[in-house]
């Protein structure tokens, strides 16, 4: 399932996939795969993404 919440939060912060990837130390392809729903990130990666985007795990990764 696509992670549109993560993409929306990234765009709202005016960050490209590459910029977010550089901030958290992963490849742009990893960010793309997470947003497309092709990759299930580790909890540590989820936390790093949340910190950079100013969101909680619930806001970005939990469905509800």
Residue ranges and their predicted role:
Residues 1-12:
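A short, Lys/Arg-rich alpha-helix, primarily the initiator
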Residues 44-59:
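DNA major-groove recognition helix of helix-turn-helix/homeodomain DNA-binding modules
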Residues 15-30:
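Short alpha-helical DNA-recognition segment
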Residues 9, 23, 34:
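Residues in the recognition helix of alpha-helical DNA-binding motifs
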